[in-house]
Regions:
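Conserved phosphate-donor/acceptor-positioning beta-strand/loop module used by diverse small-molecule
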Residues: 1-6, 161-162
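Short, flexible micro-motifs
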Residues: 4, 86, 198
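Active-site neighborhoods of enzyme catalytic cores
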Residues: 8-11
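Long, charge-rich boundary regions
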Residues: 47-125
Length: 263
C-alpha cells in the first residue's frame, strides 16, 4: 500500500463509496486517502484499521500525464503510463515480484519495456493531431482519468464518448458521480460529446459550468474523428466507454492509425 505523508484521521470525500466499517458499521476515516476509498483507513469506534504493510510505496517522485516515478521498498521505479491507478497496478506487480524473489533490476527492466495497451492511454495520429485514447467505465475511473489528463502541460481538445450497451452498463447515471468539474481547471478550448448517449454526456459537461457554445455533439464516431482533425489544438484526449472505445478503434484501424490487434 501507499505509506506517504499522513495526517490526523479525517473523513473521505462525501461522495465516496465503501467507507463503512465492516465490524461496527461506523464511518471509516483516513490518515492517508489516495483516491476513492483507498488509503490508510481506520475506524475510530473499534479496532478495525488497515493491516500493516508488507510492501510500501513511500514516495511519489514525479507524476506526469504520460509517466510516473515512485519509490517502493527503497527502490526507485518508473512506468511509462500516467495515472495514480497505474501506480497501484505497479505496486501490486512489485509486491508479487518481491514475494517470488525477483530482483529489483529485473522488475525495472520489465517496467521499462511495458507500454500502454489498446484503449488504455493508447496513442495515435488523427491527421496531424497527437491523440490519446483512455477507457472510462465508472465514476472512480473517469475521475482518475480526468486527474491524469489535467497534468498535461499543453492545451488539448477533449472528446467524451458515452455508449450504453451491456458491456458499458446500460445505466449511465454514474457520469454524475464522476468529477467532470475538474475540466474547468484544464486548458481545453473545445469539447466533443459523442456516442449513443452523446446528449447525456453533453448535459453533464454543461452542468460543470463549461461554456455550452464550446461543446459539440455528434453521435457518429466518424464525425467525432472529423471534429478532432479540424480543431486547433495539436493534442487530443478521447475518453470513451468500452464499446465506444472498440468502435472508435475499429475506425482508426480502418484508417491504419492503429493496429487491429488488441494487445
Amino acid at each position: 500500500g501507499f505509506d506517504t505523508e499522513k495526517h490526523a484521521p479525517e473523513l473521505a470525500h462525501y461522495n465516496t463509496e465503501g467507507i463503512v466499517c465492516p465490524k461496527c458499521e461506523s464511518i471509516l476515516q483516513y490518515r492517508l486517502n489516495t483516491y476513492a476509498n483507498l488509503g490508510d483507513y481506520v475506524c475510530l469506534n473499534c479496532d478495525f484499521h488497515r493491516p500493516e504493510l508488507d510492501y510500501k510505496l513511500t514516495e511519489l517522485t514525479k507524476i506526469t500525464n504520460t509517466t510516473s516515478e515512485f519509490v517502493i521498498d527503497g527502490q526507485d521505479y518508473k512506468i511509462n503510463v500516467g495515472g495514480l491507478y497505474n501506480i497501484y497496478n505497479a505496486l501490486a506487480a512489485v509486491s508479487v515480484a518481491e514475494f517470488f524473489g525477483v530482483a529489483p533490476e529485473q522488475i525495472k527492466a520489465g517496467f521499462d519495456k511495458s507500454r500502454a495497451v489498446f484503449g488504455r492511454q493508447e496513442t495515435f495520429k488523427i491527421g496531424d493531431k497527437s491523440c490519446t485514447l483512455v477507457l472510462i467505465k465508472n465514476p472512480v475511473g473517469a475521475s482518475q482519468a480526468l486527474d491524469m489528463i489535467k497534468l498535461a502541460d499543453y492545451p488539448f481538445s477533449l472528446s467524451v464518448l458515452l455508449n450504453a450497451n451491456y458491456a458499458d452498463g446500460i445505466d449511465t447515471s454514474w457520469i454524475w458521480d464522476a468529477n467532470f468539474e475538474s475540466i474547468l481547471e484544464m486548458d481545453i478550448p473545445e469539447i466533443n460529446a459523442g456516442g449513443v448517449r452523446h446528449s447525456e454526456i453533453a448535459r453533464r459537461l454543461r452542468v460543470t459550468g463549461y461554456p455550452e457554445e464550446k461543446i459539440t455533439q455528434a453521435e457518429k464516431l466518424e464525425d467525432i474523428m472529423a471534429l478532432i482533425e479540424k480543431q486547433d489544438c495539436d493534442h487530443a484526449y478521447i475518453l470513451a466507454t468500452y464499446t465506444a472505445m472498440l468502435e472508435f478503434r475499429d475506425i482508426l484501424a480502418q484508417r491504419h492509425a492503429v493496429g487491429k490487434e488488441m494487445n
